[in-house]
Amino acid sequence: EFESTILGPSVPDLVALTNEALSISITQKKSIIDTTTIRYALHRKTWDLEADRNLSPAKEHGTLFYQVGRAFAHTVLLRNCSIDPISIYIKKNLCEAGDSSLYKWYFELGTSMKKLTILLYLLTCSAGSIAQDLLSPPGPDEQNLITSYGLVENDSDLVHGLSDIVHGLLELEGALVGSSPTEEEVEGTEEEVEGTEEEVEGTEEEVEGTEEEVEGTEDEEVEGTEEEVEGTEEEVEGTEEEVEGTEEEVEGTEEEVEGTEDEEVEGTEEEVEGTEEEVEGTEEEVEGTEEEVEGTEEEVEGTEEEVEGTEEEVEGTEKDSSQFDNDRVTLLLRPKPRNPLDIQRLIYQHQKYESELEEDDDDDEDVFAPQKMLEDLFSELVWSPRIWHPWDFLLDCEAEIPAEEIPEEEDELPEDALETEVAVWGVEEEGEADDEEDVLLEAQQEDELLEEEDEELDEEEDELDEEEEEPKEEEDELHEEEEEEEEEEEEEDELQENDSEFFRVKPIIPRHRWIFRKKKDVFEVLSYPEEATEISKELLRLLNPKTKRDAPKRPRQRWWTKKKQDKHYELLLDRQRWLITKRSLSKSNGFFRSNTPSESYQYLSNLFLSNRRLLDQMTKTFFRKMAFPG
C-alpha cells in the first residue's frame, strides 16, 4: 500500500517517522498504530511543520521559557538541594511554621553567598525571564508573558524585600560565623588532618611498644616462675636425701623421723601449691594486659575512621568550591561585618534622642497653650498691615437685622462683648460715639442704594413677566437680562471700591455695636503645621474677598477647627524615629539594595551563557514536548 511512498535514504528518516507515528497514537490514546496514523505521520514529516507549530497559542512560550530557566537553574546550581525554592514560592502553603527540615535547608542556604544570589532570583522567576531574553527577545509591542501568567505579582517590591532579607542574613552571618571558608582555611584544615594522622601514627608506635613490653614481661615472669619451681624441686630432693640420712643414722627413732617427714613434706607441698597460685595470678595479669592492648587497638581504629571522615569533608569542601569557582562568573562581594559596639552605640543614641524629645515635649506644654497661641496668632494676623474690607460683614448684618431690634443704648451690650471688642479690634473707649455715628450714616447710605437697586430689579422683573408671552423674543430677553446682571455687579463693585477708599483713610476700623451683641466666640487654632498654609490662604480670602460670596455669611462663623495637640506631638515623635531609622539603614542598605538585582542578573546571565550547550539541549527538549505532547 505504501509502495508509492518515497522514504528518506537513511535509517534516521524511518526512525523519525516511527517516532512521529508513536507520538500521534499516544496523543490520540490509541493502543494500535493503524494505516491512518501512519499516513498522518508521513504527512506531518513531509510538509513543513511551521504551520503546525503556529497552531499552539503564543502565550505558551512564556511558560516554556519559565520551565527552561527553572530546569536549567535546578540542574546546574541546585543538584544537591532536596527542595525547589520556586515551588515553595508558588505554593505558599508549604512554608508552615515548625517545619524543621525547611528551616534547616534555608539556614544552610543562607550561609552561602552564592546560593543566596541564586535564591534571590529563583524566587522572583528571573531564571525564566533570563532564558526568554537570551532565546527570544520580546518586541517593542510585546509584554512580559511571565508576569502576565501571575507567577510574580510585583517583581520590584519582592526583589527589594528579598534584598533586605539577604542583607540581614549577611549581617547575621558576619556577626556569628564570620567570613566564608576560603582556600587558606581549607589548607589549614588539611594541615590539621595531617597532624592528626601523625598523632595516630605515634599512637600506633606507642601501642607496638606496649605490646613488646607486655611480651617481655610475660617472658621474664614465666621464666622466673619456672626457675623458682625448679629450685623448689631441688630443695625437695635435698630434703629427701637428708631424710634418708637421718633414717640411717637414727634407726631407733623411726616414729620421730616419720613425724618429721610428714611435717616437712606437708610444709613443702603447701609451698609448692602457693607457688602455683602465684603463677596463675601472673597469667591472669598477662591476660588483662592483652585486653588493654586490644582496647588500645580499637581506639586507634576509631581515630583512623575520624581522620578518614575529616579527609572526606575536606574533599567535599574542595568540590563545592570548584563547582562555582570554575564557571568564570562574577560574584557579589560580601559586606564587611559590622562591629557590635557600633550597633550598641547607635541604639543608645536613638534611645537618648527619644528621651530628649519627650523632655522637650514636657517643657513645651506651656509654650503651646491655647491662650498663648491665640494671642500670638492675633498679634501676627489681626494687627498685620493689611487693607481690610469689612463692608460685607456690615451689609450682611444690616440686611438680616430689622431696625426695630437694634438696641439704642450701649449699656445693653454684655461685658464680655466689650472685652472682646477691645481685645480684637483694639478700639479705645474715647471717641466711640463719633465712630458709631459715621458707621450708621454709611450704613444708611448703603441701605438706600440697595433699596434703589431692588426697586429697579422688581421693575425689570415685571417687564420680563409681561414680555414672556411673546415666544420669539425669549432669547433676546435672556441676553438682555444677562447684560443687566453684569451691569449690576459692576455697580456693586464700584460701590465697594468707593467704600474701600473711604476706609483706607482711617487708621483704625470702627466697630459695630450689633456684631458683638452676643457672647464672644472661642477661637480654636489648628495644631497641625501642614495645614497652616491652607489656613493662611483661607484667611486672606476671607479678609480680602474679591466678591461678596467669599465673605462669611454670619459674624459667628468659625475660621478655625479644633484638633488635639497630642496627635501633633505623636506625629513629631514618629517622624523623628523614622528619620533616625532611615539614616542608619540608608548607609549600609542603600548600596546593597540598589546593586544586588543588577549583579545577580549579570551572574545568572553569565552562568547561562557559559553553559549554552546544556541550555540549548533543554530548550529543544521542551519544544519537542510542546510540539508532541504526551
UniProtKB/Swiss-Prot annotation:
GO MF, any single term: ATP binding
Gene source species: Oenothera villaricae
Family: Belongs to the Ycf2 family.
Stretches the record annotates as Disordered: 176-335, 403-501
Name of this chain's protein: Protein Ycf2
Signal sequence bounds: none
A GO cellular component entry from the record: chloroplast stroma
Recorded superkingdom: Eukaryota
Record localization: Plastid, Chloroplast stroma
InterPro entries assigned: Serralysin-like_metalloprot_C
Function: Probable ATPase of unknown function. Its presence in a non-photosynthetic plant (Epifagus virginiana) and experiments in tobacco indicate that it has an essential function which is probably not related to photosynthesis.
Residues where ATP binds: G174, A175, L176, V177, G178, S179, S180, P181
Compositional bias segments (type: Basic and acidic residues): 316-328
Keywords annotated in UniProt: ATP-binding, Chloroplast, Nucleotide-binding, Plastid
Biased composition annotated in UniProt, kind: Acidic residues: 182-315, 403-419, 427-500
